[in-house]
Amino acid sequence: MIRKVAGVFLLMLALAGCGKERMVIPNVPVNFSALLTDPRLLKLSSPGGGVVLTGYGVAGLVIYRTTNGNYVAYDRCSTVNPEKQCAVVLDDPTFTVTDPCSGAKFLLEDGTPVKAPAELSLKKYDVFISGNTLQVRN
């Protein structure tokens, strides 16, 4: 009898562990570097400015200058169904980005979701300033 109860318990435990598996944004090498005077980065000259770049990360990069003057960078790949690699787009004003596939929104200050169905923050990359050069790496 104890074996049957233990068997049922183990089966229930195994089934409870089965659920929708969350997809994650793959880790790919990112190594972007440009002078802050580069025309592509012009909108980063003041806090609240953001730019998008293609050809880096999974779906491109979004780089944002926070209200306190720091720089942050995220992969443009939305965390909602990341297997679709839907690239978020900058909103106007550029405090948020929107996933055009799901309608989810993310705050650029820290990458957190602000509109469903997003539950996970955007994938963040490291940003370094060396002299007049901005570098984004992972």
Identify the meaning behind each predicted range:
Residues 12-15, 47, 96-97:
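Short hydrophobic/aromatic-rich motifs at helix boundaries and adjacent loops
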